[in-house]
């Protein structure tokens, strides 16, 4: 969006389909047991494997999946929109360095990031309440007021308070009221793992891509999988080789190539882009490409409440309590 607004001609290659809002339903079997957003890991044609140590045998897993569609993982995200803390940028300094850990301090400070956090939250539409998180790094209010509190979350808040903990509503990339052309959340309860049929979740599909297309300088090419980055005789990046929707190999020239395929897929693409100067993968002189990757991690828990008030049909997903 930023590049196209600045006057650059942009082509976006996406290996998955381009879904519309009408295709997002509450099909739990389709989401959890079929390959609506990602190729099913046990189907054989795109397996995901993991191993705890390099010498161990890899095994298939369903964990760590990302959306293979226009908008990527933001389409099926829960919409939690936390910011980094200052300590996240200074791990090496704070820990003094740990044995066998490749920690490094960021070359920028939180004050350098704050304007861009503010800009992104305003662009996509984030709901929240400023000033209640004692660890937050913000100087401005959220673009939108907080979402309604789920009855189960109120019980958790009470329990947390009785134990001396300070709970607070989670900032969500979900519109609590009308925002631009997008409607407010209808509290259907299907956020995490699902696409939003209401257009209220602030995925890039709902928020940024329409604006980028409106510039007339951004072209989205779905079902086109990048295969390697192309370089010239001087090892300068000159474009991308990709497989189109018909299974044919195509090439596209570009002055600038931006990799935005998640931590694993971006690293894999660079490893596949070997050259005479970079035999271990493009830009991989150190041999560290694909190592020390940073991911979006999360935890989850399940609880059963025997309380009548929880039968109220108000929710933002069973596991998506603020």
Segments from the language model and where they lie:
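Rossmann-fold NAD(P)-dependent oxidoreductase module
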Residues: 2
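Glycine-rich loop(s) and the adjacent beta-strand/alpha-helix scaffold that form part
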Residues: 5-29, 215, 224, 228-231, ...
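N-terminal FAD cofactor-binding segment of flavoenzymes
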Residues: 6-8, 15-83, 110-119, 154-161
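Structural recognition of the beta-strand scaffold that forms the well-ordered cores
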Residues: 12, 76-77, 169, 259
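Short, solvent-exposed loop/turn and secondary-structure capping segments
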Residues: 21-25, 73, 78-80, 88-89, ...
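Conserved redox-cofactor binding core of oxidoreductases
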Residues: 36, 49-62, 93-226
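FAD cofactor-binding and catalytic pocket of flavoenzymes
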Residues: 52-54, 58-66, 70-73, 77, ...
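A short, glycine/Asx- and small/polar-enriched loop/turn
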Residues: 182-185, 231-238
């Amino acid at each position: 969006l930023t590049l196209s607004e600045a006057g650059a001609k942009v082509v976006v290659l996406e290996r998955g389909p381009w879904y519309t809002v009408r295709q997002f339903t509450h099909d739990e079997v389709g989401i959890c047991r079929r390959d609506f957003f990602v190729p099913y890991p046990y189907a054989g044609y795109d397996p995901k494997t993991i191993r705890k140590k390099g010498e161990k045998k890899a095994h298939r897993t369903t964990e760590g999946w990302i959306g293979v569609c226009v908008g990527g993982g933001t389409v099926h995200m829960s919409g939690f929109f936390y910011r980094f803390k200052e300590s996240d940028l200074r791990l090496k300094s704070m820990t003094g360095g740990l044995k066998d850990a490749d920690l490094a301090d960021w070359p920028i400070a939180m004050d350098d990031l704050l304007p861009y956090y503010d800009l992104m939250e305003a662009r996509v539409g984030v709901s929240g309440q400023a000033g209640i998180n004692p660890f937050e790094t913000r100087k401005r209010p959220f673009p939108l007021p907080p979402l309604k509190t789920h009855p189960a979350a109120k019980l958790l808040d009470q329990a947390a308070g009785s134990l001396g903990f300070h709970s607070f509503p989670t900032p969500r990339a979900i519109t609590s009221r009308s925002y631009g052309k997008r409607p407010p959340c209808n509290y259907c309860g299907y956020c995490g793992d699902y696409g939003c049929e209401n257009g209220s979740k602030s995925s890039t599909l709902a928020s940024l891509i329409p604006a980028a297309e409106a510039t007339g300088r951004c072209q989205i090419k779905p079902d086109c999988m990048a295969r390697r980055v192309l370089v010239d005789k001087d090892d300068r990046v000159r474009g991308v080789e990709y497989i189109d929707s018909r299974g044919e190999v195509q090439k596209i020239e570009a002055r600038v190539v931006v990799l935005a395929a998640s931590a694993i897929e971006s690293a894999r693409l660079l490893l596949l882009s070997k050259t005479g100067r970079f035999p271990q993968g493009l830009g991989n002189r150190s041999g560290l490409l694909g190592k020390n990757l940073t991911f979006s991690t999360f935890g989850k828990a399940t609880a059963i409440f025997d309380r009548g008030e929880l039968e109220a049909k108000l929710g933002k997903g069973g596991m998506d309590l603020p």
